[in-house]
Amino acid sequence: MIYPYKEHKPDIHPTAFIADNATITGDVVIGEQSSIWFSVVIRGDVAPTRIGNRVNIQDLSCLHQSPNKTLLIEDDATIGHQVTLHSAVIRKNALIGMGSIILDGAEIGEGAFIGAGSLVPPGKIIPPGHLAFGRPAKVIRPLTEEDRKDMQRIRSEYVEKGQYYKFLQQT
């Protein structure tokens, strides 16, 4: 369901796939070829949420903000299943592993990988191109070429799947 909130209505690019049971409300912008999967909740009723191009937000994830703190997800990011994002910044090509929680003011660097089940506390900065995981998340090592290839494969698969499901919605 897509809901306005006060004067704000979600702005969703026509090439984006939005699962029928996803909920999006308020000041939310979603870029081209992005995919919002089943049972995702994106609330833009406190502050803006900005989602770039070719971003995939997987099943059961929840996105929200604190007052005056935008939630930003840059192009080509992957947000795994059942992730909670709250007023964070997710840079280009980053991957957030399933079940992770990223809190207010945290910044996940370009091409960084947050391992499944991690908790990134408020204000924590994960450097570009690094693997971090744990509760709280700690930087473990730079990503390998194999890590980067896996992340690219996942991104590409989700763009393809999203476009397939978008096609099904239109038939």
From Swiss-Prot:
One of its GO terms (molecular function) is transferase activity. It comes from the Bacteria. Its EC number is 2.-.-.-. InterPro entries: Hexapep (IPR001451), LbH_gamma_CA-like (IPR047324), Transf_Hexapept/Carb_Anhydrase (IPR050484), Trimer_LpxA-like_sf (IPR011004). Keywords: Transferase. It is an enzyme of class 2 (transferase). Belongs to the transferase hexapeptide repeat family. This is Uncharacterized transferase YtoA. It comes from Bacillus subtilis (strain 168). The lineage of its organism: Bacteria, Bacillati, Bacillota, Bacilli, Bacillales.
